[in-house]
């Protein structure tokens, strides 16, 4: 606190300091202190732009994905829209163009959807960004992964960012949505073909001991059998991640599942 006070008083002119305050019943609360080059992007502006381009999340192609493939009423319990005093995440899946996955479970086909998610922080804890994911309707898992032509977009909060963030984000989303389903099916089939000889050792190289145990338990619960292949491991990882409360931590784990598909 002393260092912060000294820096604010000595290192910068008061005109260069941006302060974000939130008014409440108990008075004003300091949410963020930023420098002159910082360009704040409001969460409300992002959600408004997404609604304008992609719909309201319940009626367009990109929607809050329904549980187990059913069109359900979006509630606080099943929503894929998250916000806190630090950051925001919006997950939307292309519900109208689902991908049929052969032999998803017990010889039965399943469905997946391509989706995208946007994250932002009004207080400067992270960049504004977008990445793509696959939504598995069998178990409501998310795999943070996309086709090769889609790259994750990260935009720093600078003074000019409000004028350009949407122009960089929208083409990536449209490219992913308009891509063929064959690349998704092939990636899954390739991952299924790679067998894991020692699952415990394989997971231990990537996760802690407790996480590895939880991943194996999640796959056993969801699929009714132990992990045997790279695809099984990805499914177990996302099953474990599904129970992580904070979205930034959950996404970090879901990215690991996507890395397995890339490695297949």
Task: Cite the ranges covered by each PLM segment.
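Feature for intrinsically disordered/low-complexity regulatory segments and propeptides
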Residues: 1-49, 53
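Intrinsic disorder/low-complexity polar-acidic segments
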Residues: 40, 44, 48-264
């Amino acid at each position: 606190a002393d260092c912060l006070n000294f820096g604010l008083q000595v290192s910068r002119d008061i005109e260069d300091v941006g302060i974000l305050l939130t008014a409440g019943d108990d008075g004003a609360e300091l949410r963020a202190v930023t420098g002159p080059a910082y360009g704040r992007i409001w969460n409300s502006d992002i959600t408004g732009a997404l609604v304008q381009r992609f719909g309201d999340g319940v009626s367009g192609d990109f929607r809050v994905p329904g549980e187990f493939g059913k069109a359900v009423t979006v509630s606080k319990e099943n929503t894929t829209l998250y916000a806190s005093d630090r950051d925001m995440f919006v997950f939307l899946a292309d519900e109208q163009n689902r991908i049929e996955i052969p032999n998803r479970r017990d010889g039965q086909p399943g469905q997946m959807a391509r989706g995208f998610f946007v994250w932002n922080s009004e207080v400067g804890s992270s960049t504004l960004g977008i990445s793509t994911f696959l939504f598995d309707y069998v178990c409501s898992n998310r795999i943070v992964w996309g086709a090769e032509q889609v790259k994750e977009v990260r935009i720093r909060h600078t003074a000019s960012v409000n004028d350009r963030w949407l122009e960089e984000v929208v083409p990536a989303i449209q490219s992913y949505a308009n891509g063929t389903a064959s690349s998704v099916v092939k990636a899954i089939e390739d991952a299924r073909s790679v067998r894991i000889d020692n699952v415990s050792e394989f997971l231990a190289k990537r996760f802690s001991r407790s996480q590895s145990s939880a991943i194996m338990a999640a796959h056993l619960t969801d699929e009714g059998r132990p992990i045997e292949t790279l695809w099984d491991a990805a499914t177990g990882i996302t099953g474990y991640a599904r129970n992580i409360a904070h979205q930034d931590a959950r996404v970090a784990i879901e990215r690991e599942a996507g890395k397995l598909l890339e490695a297949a």
